[in-house]
């Protein structure tokens, strides 16, 4: 019965769904979601992003589409296309707020209802990947998201951390959450992993080193890679530019493209 419902829904044309999780805020989860979408697009894939970080919807600004409006069609909400080729589509509560600075001051049941509505009522059309950018932590919103997506058999989750022990500790709780909810862990990404000097290419570990990789080994899950601090990446996000296209020689580019390739490989293995 679940499979019949999934085929007839707005997610029926989506081949692979993956969630991006983090144990705490400020680790760059939305940055990884954004750059993963761009990397997959440059691999020839059609990508959707569902931003369910209801209290901190930052992805519309990262694509410089924060002033766009969401329209209705017979099938539901039409997502916002972030590029002329319409290869990346985005849905976020940021498009539904009257003012950009409005705060979402809602209790759990109202948030959970909107998440379920996002899953059911966005007309995505045909997509190769749908990336679901979640709030930090483990809460009712995460449970609602996983339960709403379960009929569509998500590919799995990417966990984002930074090298510090406090962030790595929070990701351990995310691993437990994934285990309890039956969500497959595709791997761990360590973000802000050192700063590579643009002049001499020497890497300085500003925080600490290797926490994400060590956790992945301990938990028995793949380590997808370390993404260094990169001023060009920050600049591209501030200006809504395509980092993957414009900065192929930057220090973060190889790590981000390797992460995307591993996701593509995992999706191919699942399909075969």
Curated annotation (Swiss-Prot):
Binds 4 [4Fe-4S] clusters per heterotetramer. Contains two stable clusters in the N-termini of NUBP1 and two labile, bridging clusters between subunits of the NUBP1-NUBP2 heterotetramer. It comes from the Eukaryota. GO terms for molecular function: 4 iron, 4 sulfur cluster binding; ATP binding; ATP-dependent FeS chaperone activity; iron-sulfur cluster binding; metal ion binding. Its cofactor is [4Fe-4S] cluster. ATP binds at residues 23-30. Keywords: 4Fe-4S, ATP-binding, Cytoplasm, Iron, Iron-sulfur, Metal-binding, Nucleotide-binding. It is found in: Cytoplasm. GO terms for biological process: iron-sulfur cluster assembly. [4Fe-4S] cluster binds at residues 197, 200. Disulfide bonds: none annotated. Heterotetramer of 2 NUBP1 and 2 NUBP2 chains. Component of the cytosolic iron-sulfur (Fe/S) protein assembly (CIA) machinery. Required for maturation of extramitochondrial Fe-S proteins. The NUBP1-NUBP2 heterotetramer forms a Fe-S scaffold complex, mediating the de novo assembly of an Fe-S cluster and its transfer to target apoproteins. This is Cytosolic Fe-S cluster assembly factor NUBP2. It comes from Gallus gallus (Chicken). The gene is NUBP2.
